[in-house]
Structures are given as C-alpha cells and as structure tokens.
Amino acid sequence: MSARVSAFELEVLRSAFETIADELAIIVMRTSCSSIVRDAIDYSTAICDARGRTLAQGATTPLHLGSFHDAMRNLLATQGARVAEGDVYIFNDPYLAAGQHLPDIYIVRPIFVSGGLEGWATTVAHQNDIGGIVPGSNSIGSTEIFQEGLRLPLLKLFDGGRENAAIWDILAANVRVPDKVLGDVKAQLAACLVGEREFARLFARWEPERFRAACDEIHDHAERLARAEIADIPDGTWRFENHIDGLGDAPEPIPFRVALTVRGDEIVVDWTGTSPEVRAGINSPVPFTNAASWAAIRSVLSPDIPNAQGFTRPIRVVAPPGTIVNPRPPAACGARGITGFRMMDCLMGALAQALPDRVPADGSGGSTLPTIGGRHEGRPFIFVETIMGAWGGGMQRDGQDAVAHLGANQSNVPVEAIEAEYPISVERYGFVADSGGPGRHRGGLAIEREFRLLADEATLTVRSDKRRFPPHGLAGGRPGSGSLSVLNPGTPGARVLPVLVTEPVAMRRGDVFRHVLASGGGWGDPLDRDPAAVLEDLRLGRVTIEGARRDYGVVAVEAPDGPRLDDAATLALRRALRGAAG
C-alpha cells in the first residue's frame, strides 16, 4: 500500500491528535489535587511521535509551547535503546534532563503498538512544592539550583510496567505538601495512560507505514504554513530593549535586548546583549528561552498553523551561554517565569515594528505569583496564586481587562476555592479606575487583590513585575500604570514590598497582603478617543470624571441618571490641549 497521505486524511489525523492532547489536559485538570493545576491551569500536555517530536499540544499554557521539544530530544538521546513498553519517565531538572525549572515535573510514557515504539504521551505540571528554601519553591533569592528543591534527572517511575516505589517515597519526603504533589503526579500519570490508549486506537485504524508518513507530513505541513506566514513579514531587523526592575530592596535594572531578523521565510531571534546570568532564581534555562521565543512568534502567525514541532523549523533562537536566557549550571531558575514573560514582551515590542496592525501595546506582564505558606491546625498549607492583569490597547480595540498574559492562558484561583481550602480570606478583588494606559484605544485596567491571613503565621514570597518600567504604549498611546505590593495597607505599619522579593516576608494572623498589577499601555493619541467610549468607561467606573478630563480631554458632569458629556467644553479643552502640545 502506498504511504502517500491525502490532505483530507492528514487533517483528520491532525485533528485527532489535537483532540487526544486536549483530552489529556482535561484529565489532568479534573483529577489533580492542587489549585495551581486544577484552577490556575499551570500545566501542559502533548502527543509526540516515535521520534519524540510534538504532534499536538493541549490548549493550556503557551509558554510551555515547545517545552517537550528539548526534553524529548534529550530523553531519546540518553535513553534510546533502554526505552521499553510499560515505562514511565519522571524528571524536572533543567540542566540534567532539559526541563524548565524544578517545580515543573514531567511525566512521559512511551506508546508501544504490536511491540514497536510509535509515540509518546507527555505531560508537565507545576507542582505546589518541590522542597527548597521557601514554601512553593519559587524563591527569588536562591543563588543556585541546589537551594530550589528536589532535582530529578531522567528516572523511570515505572520500568517495564514495574513501579519504582522508592521514587514516590523520595518525592513525598522532600516536599511540604506530599498529598498535593503526589496527587498531581498521579493525575499526570492517569492522563498518559489515557493518551496511550487513545493513540493506540487511532494507530489501529491506519496501515503502519502510512501512519508514520502522516506524522512526518504533519510536521512538514506546519513548517510550510509557518514559512508562508513568515514570508509575508517585511524583511529586516527590528530591535527592542526592556528591563526587569531588579532584585530586592535595592534593585538594579536587568536589561533584555532582542534583535528580530526576518529574511525570506526564516526568522532569527537573537538575545545577544541581554543581561548576564544573575545570582537569583530568575534565570531562564535555554529550553524555556526557546519556548518563550517560539510562543511569541507563533502568536502573530495564523491560528490555522498546527502546534506541531515542524512550525519551529524556520525559527532560530540565539541565546548566548552565561546570560540570563541561557545560564550555566548551577544557576538558580525556580522563578524563571518572569523572564519568560519579559522575553515574550520584548519580542512583541520588536514585532510591533514589523507588524503594527497585529501587535497591541504592552500589557501588565506575566502573572504576579504570590505564595503564602505555613501551618494551620497542625497541617501544612501552600497557597500559590496567579494574579492576572491586562493587555495593551491595539489598532482596532481597547486592551482586554483581567486576562492572562499572552504566554500564560491561565486563570486565577476562584475566591470560593481559596477560602474553602486555605486559611486565607480574600478582602478585595477588582479593577483600579483610571489605571488603563490612555490612548485612542485604552489599555486594560489594573487588577487589585487583597489576602488576609487567618493562620497564626506564614511566609510570603512575591514574584511581580513592571513597577519602575511600566507597560509602554504604541502609536502615541501612553504607558500603563505600574505594579505595587503592600503588606498591611492603610495601617501605620504598612510596608511596600520590592517588585521581586528576595527574602521571605513573615506574616502573622490578620496581616493583609495587597497587590496591584500593572495595567495595559494605550494605543494612539488619547485625544483621538471617541468621547462616547470615554462616557461608557465613566458609566462602568473604569474612568473617573477627573481622569476623563486629565487623560482624554473629555468634559463630563454628574447627572441623576449618570454622567453626561459636555460636548462644547470637550471640544474646547481638546483644542487647547492639542495647542499646548504643539
């Protein structure tokens, strides 16, 4: 029988792989034990071919896009002939196993059909804890990976179907909340078992040679589509520079520099000039740097391109060794998420120059990650939250409010779940008026949240961003507002915390932690914003009467039925403001 596969058959098979990958994602969500996986959706799933190449990835975390590429390449290069039916691999180490950071545990299972290796079911999930010097294992202040928790090189959790009970024991002994961690790993294992079953069922419907040829063609097809899209981007080199605020109480800006070069149907992402690696937990191992770079490029290409590994072939990532985007062991990397988000934001800044109609102004940055851990009623608890922010305004519309960063696609933990599961009360959750970056199209609003501790004591760590360097606007739009973290706001003992907290903060019963995320930058001249849109923002409480006048030159007055525009005064004020601006 010919190995040739029709376009129709290829699309059916590709869709089947995507369905299986999404089914794995649903299984992990529905069977996991921790809120960081179940509610915040900090995990990913994928189906790979026999060579470990990603055929489809579940619709969860874009920053994990490609996270299986390096891991599977390393696994097959080092394990190769030792891979056997019934095996399950577990690993997390970025230096020994091409992982991303220690909290992200990979569970992968080879799929054998009729005695031959035909594919892989793969999962990665952020664990609530993996040991180390702070609860939640997201220490900014770590100076080397040995301080960050349990390192798992490539290990067989199951060897030919035989369970390695010692690994479970080691894992349980090294984490603060073993019930959560082991439960989530078992959820990943369950997903892989289902992936194996569904893949085998799909394989049985095909002639083996044609199935393998179709897998190759899925990669080739993704590559062709990506190249066609890249070819439509103007040739040239676009540069962008930005900074993370810095570390601790005396922060020094940490620069990120990217040169995005388009030549024909290929792209080079060059991070030369970016900060050297730092003695802190925000270094990005190169597999994560690759994933962040691919995800940014992928976001401006057609959604019809499959998330198969072939789409990465036209993209070359240059990450100089010894930098924050390619650290040398044993550099710490537990809180590397902020660096991934900043890399994506830098790339979007470069892409905005090449594709101004596709890229919005800068957003709030990655999710703020506060972690509160301690003991309550004799039991340990670790609360990890992903506070989501806003997108910048774009050429066509205002920025989105209260959504995940482009690279996250995650969610906050619902208030009801927090208060039911943890000794924490959510005191405040809402938008901050007048915070969105002014523009013809306004940036999304900042979000504020307050958490009150109900346990006797706990420790707090915070990973946030964009206070000193707030989100930039585009096309004449103004910057968004910066972030803020405060312990016990509005009290005589109020304490403003650093953007990146390097030393755990002690909390006592009744203490309140307040965080305000950065907002989105604006797009276009604020004086060109439709006054009717400003009026709608006034009615919804997104903008105040004072803010409308100050930021948009719109004059409104309060009335019994809500604010009303003063058209004549608005016209006069805008004329005066434009004249003053020259």
Residue ranges and their predicted role:
Residues M1-E85, I90-V113, L117-G582:
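Glycine/proline-enriched, intrinsically flexible loops and inter-domain linkers
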